[in-house]
Amino acid sequence: MSGSNMGYYDVLAGLSALEKSSQVVFSATELQQLTQQSHATDKGIEGSENSKAKVSKPKRVAVHGYLGGKVSLADAAQVEYEVGHSLLGSYVPRQQLEALSSVDFSHHFHRTLECKAALETHDVFLAGAGQLSLPFQSHIESPRNSEAKRKRKVIICKRCQSRFIGSHRRSQLREHACVD
């Protein structure tokens, strides 16, 4: 864990994404290390917010015509909004979602599917560093067994051992009269 730069909330989010939070128990020293890292990043963020408050924010550029107003294609092509700051994970507020261009939205969606933090958390706390976190098994590479036949749903009469196959097998069994 000493080599990881993940904060407390990053670790919790990664474990909950993989539904493995019940398998990990942190010691008191590990919790202190995780919270100290998050305190350090919080202090860095507060300092940068104070410096940003002095600088005026640029005006938002309309990138969709349906929002009203005119769209400048040159300005819209150069605009990039930050979508990684959302506190609710993949939730993006409606106003911000409407302002995203299709390229920004695809980057946000790709980041949501990527699960980079979850896999890093799995490597550090569950699988140990250096191991592959989730092995990929390809169905193409696996050999097909000729012996493995398709399983068929069959109802067998207990008295005469008659077999009924198909979608109407229950009704056929009810109408069946055993010949003993």
Curated annotation (Swiss-Prot):
Q: Predominant location of this chain? A: nucleus
Q: Upper taxonomic classification of the species?
A: Eukaryota, Fungi, Dikarya, Ascomycota, Saccharomycotina
Its assembly, as annotated, is: Interacts with STH1, RSC3 and ARP9. Component of the two forms of the RSC complex composed of at least either RSC1 or RSC2, and ARP7, ARP9, LDB7, NPL6, RSC3, RSC30, RSC4, RSC58, RSC6, RSC8, RSC9, SFH1, STH1, HTL1 and probably RTT102. The complexes interact with histone and histone variant components of centromeric chromatin. Component of a fungal-specific module (HTL1-LDB7-NPL6-RSC3-RSC30) within the RSC complex.
**Can you say what this protein is called?**
Chromatin structure-remodeling complex protein RSC14
Q: Which domain of life is it from?
A: Eukaryota
Task: State what this protein does.
Answer: Component of the chromatin structure-remodeling complex (RSC), which is involved in transcription regulation and nucleosome positioning. RSC is responsible for the transfer of a histone octamer from a nucleosome core particle to naked DNA. The reaction requires ATP and involves an activated RSC-nucleosome intermediate. Remodeling reaction also involves DNA translocation, DNA twist and conformational change.
Keywords assigned: Chromatin regulator, Nucleus, Transcription, Transcription regulation
Q: Output the GO biological process annotations, alphabetical, semicolon-separated.
A: chromatin remodeling; nucleosome disassembly; transcription elongation by RNA polymerase II
Its GO CC terms are: chromatin; RSC-type complex
Q: Which gene is transcribed and translated to give this protein?
A: LDB7
Q: Which InterPro entries match?
A: Rsc14
Query: Where can this protein be found?
Result: Nucleus
